[in-house]
Amino acid sequence: MARPRRSGKKKEKKNVPVGIAHVKATFNNTIITFTDLKGNVISWATSGASGFKGSRKSTPFAAQVAAETAARKAQDQGMRTVGIFVKGPGSGREAAMRAIGNVGMKVNFIRDITPIPHNGCRPPKRRRV
């Protein structure tokens, strides 16, 4: 039986030549989001959405695959030049930044915006393994 046609609006192709890549590297996952200069999301990808599960999500290779996926989607929308904001202590920071450059995007700047507490909340207790 034929499936009914999907109604609703199709994703329109934007032409955004300059944008910002936000890389959030946590201990468990890496999230890459490409936005325009106003902050509207153009494309995104995560290590988990790229097919990695469990502890493999936190590897540099998973971050590289996610960054390449998000960068290619952003290039399809016309993005050529990008600035990178990096946040978090994860292992995928460097791999994600390198992957964005290797896809063919021109990187304007790299800025670390990891939030640092001025003696705010008490940190979690140390792990004893």
Swiss-Prot record:
GO biological process: translation
Regions crossing the membrane: none
Listed InterPro entries: Ribosomal_uS11, Ribosomal_uS11_bac-type, Ribosomal_uS11_CS, Ribosomal_uS11_sf
Tagged with keyword DNA-binding: no
GO molecular-function term, one example from the UniProt record: rRNA binding
Gene Ontology CC terms: ribonucleoprotein complex; ribosome
Gene3D superfamilies: Ribosomal protein S11
Function, as annotated: Located on the platform of the 30S subunit, it bridges several disparate RNA helices of the 16S rRNA. Forms part of the Shine-Dalgarno cleft in the 70S ribosome.
Family of the protein in this entry: Belongs to the universal ribosomal protein uS11 family.
Name of protein: Small ribosomal subunit protein uS11
Lineage: Bacteria, Pseudomonadati, Thermodesulfobacteriota, Desulfovibrionia, Desulfovibrionales
